[in-house]
Regions:
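Bacterial N-terminal signal peptides
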Residues: 12-20
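Non-cytosolic beta-sheet module surface loops
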Residues: 140, 149-153, 198-200
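Aromatic-lined ligand-binding clefts that engage carbohydrates, nucleic acids, or primary amines
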Residues: 145-160, 194
């Protein structure tokens, strides 16, 4: 009788675990898919949907009013893991942050905006008081001068293009399309590495990003070549 009950208990635990993972997968599939091809292009409005996302790093913040320029530069320039501004991550790669081991995920968003909160939820990560890292690679067939990086994020964020700080969105903010734009830059012929960090205390986390020309029109003649 004891062995029978023990067997039933183990079976119940196994079913619960399987259901939990299935639910997490379904949640992820609601917002993301695994890249099906080696390259992709921006959507019809120019938004870049393919990203390498790192599971969120714990960064204690009970409020977002602390997100001043100086606070953010300290937070974003702190080294949480080796090569965070130089390494091009691959899907499934692991990084060590303190006592935690976090994974990189190559994902294609089903929406124009990247739902970081849902990503964290699906990977069973902490949801509040966190910092997300995102990386994508843009390939150009020729130099594209005088473009602007246009970003909306919830909450604050910082963005680098080819290793240069290009845009900072400070303060407690909601995600709004083209909420902030960079100075004019040139996307060079070949590969351009885009890195971003998004920080949030309480509330949802997401971002949207595209490049626009001097008329404010989206740049679409580029390829996204993140490793799968």
């Amino acid at each position: 009788m004891y062995k029978h009950n023990l067997k039933k208990a183990f079976l119940a635990i196994a079913i619960a675990m399987a259901t939990s993972w299935s639910t997490a997968s379904a949640q992820l599939n609601d917002y993301f898919s695994k890249p099906a091809s080696a390259t992709s292009t921006p959507d019809d409005k120019g938004f870049i949907r393919r990203w390498m996302l790192l599971e969120p790093i714990v960064k204690e913040n009970r409020t977002n009013i602390v997100f001043t320029d100086s606070y953010l530069r300290d937070a974003f320039n702190h080294e949480y893991f080796k090569g965070q501004k130089t390494v091009l991550p691959k899907d499934g790669a692991k990084v060590k942050v303190g006592d935690e081991t976090l994974l990189w995920h190559s994902l294609e968003s089903n929406l124009y905006n990247i739902k970081l909160f849902r990503f964290g939820e699906a990977t069973k990560s902490r949801l509040y008081g966190v910092l997300y890292w995102a990386v994508t690679v843009v390939k150009c067939n020729e130099d594209i001068p005088n473009v602007r990086l246009a970003v909306g994020s919830n909450s604050a964020s910082m963005w680098w293009v080819n290793g240069e700080e290009t845009l900072l969105l400070s303060g407690d903010r909601r995600m709004v399309v083209d909420d902030a734009m960079s100075h004019r830059i040139t996307l060079k012929k070949g590969t351009n590495i885009i890195r971003g960090a998004v920080i949030n205390g309480p509330g949802m986390s997401d971002f949207c990003l595209r490049f626009v020309n001097e008329k404010g029109e989206p740049i679409k003649n580029i390829e996204i070549i993140n490793p799968r």
